[in-house]
Swiss-Prot record:
Upper classification of the organism: Bacteria, Pseudomonadati, Spirochaetota, Spirochaetia, Spirochaetales
Name of the protein in question: Methionyl-tRNA formyltransferase
Classification via CDD domains: FMT_core_Met-tRNA-FMT_N, Met_tRNA_FMT_C
EC numbers, comma separated: 2.1.2.9
Keywords: Protein biosynthesis, Transferase
Function in brief: Attaches a formyl group to the free amino group of methionyl-tRNA(fMet). The formyl group appears to play a dual role in the initiator identity of N-formylmethionyl-tRNA by promoting its recognition by IF2 and preventing the misappropriation of this tRNA by the elongation apparatus.
One MF annotation (Gene Ontology) recorded for this entry: methionyl-tRNA formyltransferase activity
Entry GO terms, CC: cytosol
Length: 315
């Protein structure tokens, strides 16, 4: 089976490496190079670099015009495999592939159709999520399910953590799906009545409101790592939050919302909220390295009693 691989994200790298071992990958579609770093030099993503290293034809157009479509047709691909590309395809493009098109989606479809399934699962405090290998349909994330696998989300897991987990679990699931396709399996239709949807995170998604419950705040902090990163303000500047947990206790009701009320070397830095205690576990001052809560506290012993304020904006 000749496979045409489509991705622009490192989350798909392990799948790409595994597929190349078992199938003929005739081409790769990815996004154009992007400026990166202080010098804003154009940088190739890891999928493109890996494809070049394996001498696989790479397409990185701004738009899929007729010329690009014809070049892809000339490769005579049987099937397209898509994992985190970031654009929606027209029927004309999908019709190029006689054995169809499949997609790796990091949620238990039909839950969390859309662009931010990992972040949304964490933001909503889900304890379980998963991976779906689906046939692609014109309607976003609505195709028949070929393979699904669930996994647990721990309370302090971040989107970065879950992305790494998805990256490691996906290769075997894709191989299983391709084997099923080879045997004529058409997949199981989704229950559209159970579909939920998720949208893009914005920079403002990382603004923390300490009037919310500790549970809601820790979910937002963990969901926003690695982007846009949650943050709030102390007297001397912004503090970026990379990881958090929470306690269902209300021992500090007399304290201000957002006030740093305690430090526990085994649990974290305690912050009072609208309900419960937020445990800050990993934090950062802008331009400096990320610190665990112990190092942050040891470097700022006057933290207790200081009060975080929200930066503003809307979620």
């Amino acid at each position: 089976m000749k496979i045409f691989f489509v991705s622009s994200s490192s989350i798909a790298l392990e799948v790409f490496k595994e597929i190349v071992k078992h199938y003929e990958v005739v081409g790769v579609l990815t996004l154009p190079d992007k400026p990166k770093g202080r010098g804003q030099k154009l940088s190739q993503n890891v999928i493109k670099l890996e494809a070049i290293a394996k001498n696989i034809k790479v397409f990185d157009p701004l738009i899929l015009d007729d010329n690009i479509l014809n070049l892809i047709r000339d490769l005579n691909p049987d099937l397209m495999l898509v994992f985190s590309y970031g654009k929606i395809f027209k029927k004309e493009f999908l019709d190029i592939f006689p054995k169809g098109c499949i997609n790796v989606h990091p949620s238990l479809l039909p839950k969390y159709r859309g662009v931010s399934p990992i972040q949304s699962a964490i933001l909503n405090g889900d304890c379980v999520s998963g991976i779906t290998i689906q046939n692609m349909a014109l309607k976003m994330d609505s195709g028949n399910i070929l393979v699904q696998k669930n996994f647990k989300i721990k309370s302090c897991d971040t989107s970065y953590d879950i992305s790494k987990l998805v990256s490691s679990l996906s290769p075997n699931l894709v191989l299983e799906a391709l084997e099923k396709i080879g045997k004529g399996f058409l997949g199981i239709p989704q229950k559209s009545s159970e579909a939920t949807f998720c949208s893009f995170f914005k920079k403002e998604s990382g603004f923390v409101d300490f009037n919310l419950s500790a549970f809601e705040i820790k979910n937002r902090i963990n969901a926003c790592n690695p982007w846009p990163l949650a943050r709030a303000r102390l007297d001397y500047g912004d503090i970026i939050f990379h990881r958090a947990d929470f306690l269902k206790i209300d021992l500090y009701k007399e304290k201000k919302v957002g006030e740093i009320v305690d430090f526990d070397s085994e649990k974290g830095l305690f912050v009072n909220t609208g309900e419960g205690i937020l445990l800050l576990l990993e934090v950062q001052r802008p331009g400096r390295r990320v610190l665990d809560y112990k190092s942050f506290y040891n470097g700022s012993r006057q933290l207790i009693g200081q009060v975080f304020s929200s930066i503003g904006g809307v979620y």
